[in-house]
Amino acid sequence: MKALSKLKAQPGIWMTDVPVPELGHNDVMIKIRKTAICGTDVHIYNWDEWSQKTIPVPMVVGHEYIGEIVAIGQEVKGFNIGDRVSGEGHITCGHCRNCRGGRTHLCRNTIGVGVNRPGCFAEYLVIPAFNAFKIPDNIPDELAAIFDPFGNAVHTALSFDLVGEDVLVSGAGPIGIMAAAICKHVGARHVVITDVNEYRLDLAKKMGVTRAVNVSKENLTDVMKELGMTEGFDVGLEMSGAPPAFRTMLSTMNHGGRIALLGIPPSDMAIDWGQVIFKGLFIKGIYGREMFETWYKMAALIQSGLDLSPIITHQFPIDEFQKGFDIMRSGQSGKVILDWQ
C-alpha cells in the first residue's frame, strides 16, 4: 500500500510502498479517507532533537485521520464494516494502575500511533478496536480528521470552569486557536490569545476571540485595561511552550487563577515561583485526551454549533503531500488536510 514514511534519519518525509498491516483478534482495519498534518509531524519532518531520540526509522508516520472500517478482528464487538471512525492515537496497556482505575489517558506505558508504531499516513491503518471512535453522520470528514488535535484543545480548555471567566490563551497555533474558540462557545467572558504570528492571530479573530494580541507590538496589560479587567485572568491555557509567554501568563493571572499547560517548554525553563505560591495558582499538566470523555465532548461541541471550519485552511490530494508539509512548516496555515481518496 501507499504510505508516507520516515525513511531516513535526516530532514524530509517520503512516499513509499509498504505491506498492508496485519489484523489482530482485537483490532479494526481502517481504510483512510483523509489525514491532517500535526505539529508533531513537522517535528518528525524537520528531524529535530526530540525526533532523533523518539522516532524509529523507517516507519509510517501520522496520527490525525478519518476513515472507514473494512475489516474487524474476531474478538471485536460494537463495530461493523463500513463504520466511519477516527481513533485515539495513544495506545494504552490496560493493566497498569491508571488504566485499571479508569484514568487511561495517564497510562505510564502509552505508545503513540505514528510516533512509536506505524501511523495513519497510509491507505490502511490497524489499531485496537478500543481506540476507535465512531463519528456521527452530521460531522464532515474534514472536521473528523482533526479530532486528535481538537481533543487536545478540548481537554485543555475544559479543565476548569469557564462560564463568565476571563481566559488567556498563549500560543495561536491550531490547538490554541481551537481552545480559544471552545472557551467562547461555552460561555467565557473575555478570551484573549497571544502570539507573534500575524497570520495565526488573524485566524484566531475569525474563530471569535475577544482580542488577538501580537505581543511584539502590544502590551498585554494595556489590552486588559482596554477590556475593563481589573483583577487578572481567571484561567490560563499555555499552548506555546515559550518561556516568555508562560512568565507573562503568571504575572497577569488573578490570585487563585488556574492554568492548564499543554505546550512543552524547555526542561530548564526558569519562572518566578513566588508568583505561583503567593498568588495561590493551580497548574495542571495536560497530555492527550481523556479516554473517552474528551471524544464525546468533541462530537457534542460540534453538534451544538461550535464552528471549527475556519481552522482548516488548506487541502491537498495525497500526491501533493510536499506542498502540505511546506505550508505547515512556513507557519502560514491553520490545519492542512491530505486527501487519500
Swiss-Prot record:
GO cellular component: cytoplasm
Pfam families documented for this protein: ADH_N, ADH_zinc_N
Active site: T40 (charge relay system), H43 (charge relay system)
Keywords for the protein's UniProt record, in alphabetical order: Cytoplasm, Metal-binding, NAD, Oxidoreductase, Zinc
Site features described as Important for catalytic activity for the proton relay mechanism but does not participate directly in the coordination of zinc atom, chain residue numbers: D148
PROSITE patterns named in the record: ADH_ZINC
Positions with a binding annotation for Zn(2+) 2: C93, C96, C99, C107
Positions with a binding annotation for NAD(+): I175, D195, R200, L262, G263, I264, I286, Y287
Pathway terms, separated by semicolons: Amino-acid degradation; L-threonine degradation via oxydo-reductase pathway; glycine from L-threonine: step 1/2
Keyword Metal-binding: yes
Cofactor: Zn(2+)
Annotated InterPro entries: ADH-like_C, ADH-like_N, ADH_Zn_CS, GroES-like_sf, L-Threonine_3-DHase, NAD(P)-bd_dom_sf, PKS_ER, Zn_alcohol_dh
Enzyme Commission code(s) on record: 1.1.1.103
Compartment(s) of residence: Cytoplasm
Keyword Oxidoreductase attached: yes
Its biological purpose: Catalyzes the NAD(+)-dependent oxidation of L-threonine to 2-amino-3-ketobutyrate.
Self-association and partners: Homotetramer.
Family: Belongs to the zinc-containing alcohol dehydrogenase family.
Protein name per the record: L-threonine 3-dehydrogenase
